[in-house]
Amino acid sequence: MIFDTLNRLGQYRGICAGLDKLIDFTLAHDLNALPAGRNEIDGDNAWMNANVAPLVPETDLYERHLEHLDLQIPLDAGEIITVRPVEELEWDFEGETGFTHGPAGTALHMVPGTFAVFFPGDAHNCGISEAGQTSCRKLVGKAKL
């Protein structure tokens, strides 16, 4: 997992080709101007979703991926994402994505100007409200490893 500020995103090039594609796309575009929905980068190998995600006061639903990483970027509001090692939880898979319920993990306080990358070994629990907000416009990039 990576949690950092967008001004340092370029420093993470070289970890894997898929992440490099997401980094290049992110740095080359006005993120607030991206249209809602799927923004193509490299077909099913890399893309960026722009959406408004609902936020709730608390949730225990974790997800993980088998072959893709996530790059998450909040654009207009804060969001808490909690993380745990995948080995600490039991998983049910629906194709590429696994879901499970689990106890609270380490909290990342995502605010505009920050980003997080979640690799297949990172269970992440998204959509927790920061300061009572009910939604967050965000980008979620996906890249195949």
Model-derived features: where do they sit?
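Surface/interface-facing alpha-helical segments and adjacent flexible terminal/loop regions used
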Residues: M1-D44
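Short acidic (Asp/Glu) patches
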Residues: N51-H65, F93-G105, D122-A123
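Short histidine-centered beta-strand/loop micro-motifs
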Residues: E58-H65, Q72, T82-R84, L108, ...
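Glycine- and acidic-residue-biased ligand/ion/polar-headgroup-sensing regions
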Residues: E67-L69, I73-I81, P85-E88, E94-H101
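A short hydrophobic beta-strand segment most commonly corresponding to one strand
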Residues: L71, F115-V117, Q133-L145
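Conserved metal-binding segment of the jelly-roll/cupin
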Residues: H109-S129
